């Protein structure tokens, strides 16, 4: 199937996504991701309000072995593509987390805002907002996730996984290229900034 055929198939699944069916299937997700998709632990991502296309892709990537998440072993192995879209539709319709950052480290937050809004051209790091939007909601049609309100701990671990090559399932591995140019402080800064981006 060519790229046009794949895009058409994804559009069909998205159009047919049944959030009610997804809600039933998502009951097993609650232990880690919370009943409404807001995780009680910073180690696991908030799914509420996330772009449907991004969530469906992640579920299918985990199922197909294109993204390794040990905690998800066996959880989505039997999901059909439609199941993935249904669960994604359920979480996408939930209210996103409204995170708050601490003002304790103003310098760290300022660096995070700088990276998010303008990037760091001296390091070859583009602005995060270029793909994730100025408000951090992401771009569903491009499968770019929303970052607003995401747990800082999870965001840092995700950036570290992209930087190390442990995760490589972003479009054209663009996140691997970007994250590999970021220092630990850069990752911490942008993660804390997006937590409070509303």
PLM features: what roles do these ranges have?
Residues 18, 25, 51, 58, ...:
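Stable alpha-helical elements in mature extracytoplasmic
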Residues 1-16, 60, 184, 195-198:
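N-terminal export/targeting leaders of redox proteins
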Residues 23-27, 52, 56, 118-129, ...:
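Sequence context surrounding c-type heme c attachment/ligation sites in exported
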Residues 10-11, 15-65:
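The feature marks the first
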Residues 8-26, 40-41, 93-121:
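Electrostatic cytochrome c docking/interface patches
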Residues 10-13, 96, 100, 111-118, ...:
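Predominantly soluble domains enriched in secretory-pathway, periplasmic, or organellar proteins
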Residues 40-46, 62-105, 140-146, 164-197:
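Axial heme c-ligation environment in periplasmic c-type cytochrome domains
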Residues 22, 29-35, 87, 125-134, ...:
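The canonical Cys-X-X-Cys-His
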């Amino acid at each position: 199937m060519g790229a046009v055929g794949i895009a058409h198939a994804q559009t069909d699944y998205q159009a047919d996504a049944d959030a009610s069916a997804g809600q039933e299937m998502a009951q097993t997700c609650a232990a880690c991701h919370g009943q409404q998709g807001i995780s009680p632990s910073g180690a696991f991502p908030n799914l509420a309000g996330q772009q449907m296309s991004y969530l469906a892709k992640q579920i299918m990537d985990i199922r197909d072995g294109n993204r390794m998440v040990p905690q998800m072993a066996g959880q989505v192995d039997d999901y059909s593509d439609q199941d993935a879209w249904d669960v994604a539709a359920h979480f996408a319709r939930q209210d996103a987390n409204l995170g708050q950052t601490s003002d304790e480290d103003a310098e760290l937050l300022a660096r995070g805002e700088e990276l998010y809004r303008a990037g760091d051209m001296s390091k070859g790091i583009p602005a995060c907002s270029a793909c994730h939007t100025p408000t951090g909601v992401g771009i569903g049609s491009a499968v770019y996730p929303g970052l607003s309100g995401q747990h800082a701990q999870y965001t840092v671990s995700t950036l570290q996984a992209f930087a190390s090559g442990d995760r490589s399932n972003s479009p054209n591995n663009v996140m691997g290229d970007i994250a590999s140019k970021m220092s630990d402080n850069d990752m911490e800064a942008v993660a804390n900034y997006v937590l409070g981006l509303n």
